[in-house]
Structure formats: C-alpha cells, structure tokens
Amino acid sequence: MKNLILFFALFLSSLTLFGQQQETLFGKSNVVGAFGGPIVEYNFANDNTQVSVGGGGAVIIGDFFLGGYGMGTTNPSWIDNVDPFKVELGHGGFWIGGTFPSHKLVHFFSSAKIGWGAVNIRFYDDNVRIDDNVFVLEPEAGVELNIFRWFRIAATANYRWVDGINPAITGVDRNYYNGFGANLTFRFGGFGNHWQKWDD
C-alpha cells in the first residue's frame, strides 16, 4: 500500500507542471486534440511475470488527458492446487494523465488508470469458470518520446493495486496481482497546439 501511495503522489505532483511548444523527432506537434493506441504491460507480482495487452484513448486538454482504457492478461497463470486452475485478470475504466513539458522531444509522462474488472478462474478438469469482481488502481510515471507529430511512445514504471479478490471464492491470494511493473504506451492522434506558434 505504501508503494501505491508513493506512485499516486508522484502522479498528482506532476499535475502542477505546464508545457509550452512542441518538439518532435520528425516534425512539429500540437497540444490539444485526441489520441488512441495500444498498451503493453509487464507486471512482476509474486515472482511471476504477467503480461497484459489492451488499449486506450483520450481527449487532450493542454498537457493533460482524460479518457478510458481496457486491459487483459495474455499469459494466464496456472495455480497447482488440489484442483489445478487457470487465473486471468481483465479490467477497464477511466484513464487520466499528463505530459510535462509535452513540447519537448523527450518529456515526463504520468498517468493513472482507475477501473473495474474481474479475476477469471477456470478449472483444468471440468472447465468450470468463476468470476470475482475487482477494483484496479494503477499509477505510472516515466518518459515519452515524440516520434512524429501524430505518434508518441511512452515507457513507464507502474504499480498495480487490485482490490476485491476473495480467496474463499477464487483460491487466489488477495495480493496476487499487486506489484510493480513496466508499460509501453503507443499514442496515435492529434496533439495540436492551437494557441502558440512556432518561431521561424
């Protein structure tokens, strides 16, 4: 929980920063618009590398954005119990964040995913499925590179906190999905700058 609080505090503190003009590797980019794109996530909880893929999109206002996301694990974990079973996590919800200063070629990127979903359990022998609803909070912080004015890549460190797992129902420890990780976020869209002009 202390790790989660630390990451969330870092995210909130970044909201006090403001950007100005845009710099990109191959062109000039804007600051107000919208974007969408895929997200790849690696988490290292319980000595187990968990890979999730998904995507998100948002409206950009200044250096901040507000939108939604969806994620799901791609490598289900097999838990060897009395009755072996496969466990997966899927979740989606709100996505808020910012880039500071976004006009720079390389700049700070911070966001938080606030969502709901379920831990899915499938037993090996009879294919029985159990769903346990959960709440997910995942702050992240890192750097982003402006490739083109319409394309950016962010590499971040995150902490995923999953609340609501009931071990009595799922047989999964309530902290099974909690832990640090790393994200790659690919953002495609219009990052417009409507109030500032570039100097010749």
Q: Model features per residue range: what roles?
A:
Residues 19-69, 187-200:
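Short glycine/proline- and aromatic-enriched beta-strand/turn motifs that initiate or cap beta-hairpins
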Residues 47, 77-80, 119-125, 164-168, ...:
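Outer-membrane beta-barrel proteins
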Residues 29-31, 46-50, 85-91, 128-136, ...:
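Transmembrane beta-barrel outer-membrane domains
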Residues 34-42, 59, 68-72, 110-116, ...:
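Transmembrane beta-barrel strands of outer-membrane/channel proteins
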Residues 63-137, 145-147, 185-188:
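Gram-negative (and chloroplast) outer-membrane scaffold detector with strong preference
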Residues 1-23:
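Bacterial Sec-dependent N-terminal signal peptides
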Residues 146-200:
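Predominantly the C-terminal beta-signal and adjacent terminal strand-loop region
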Residues 30-34, 62-64, 104-110, 149-153, ...:
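Outer-envelope beta-barrel architecture signal
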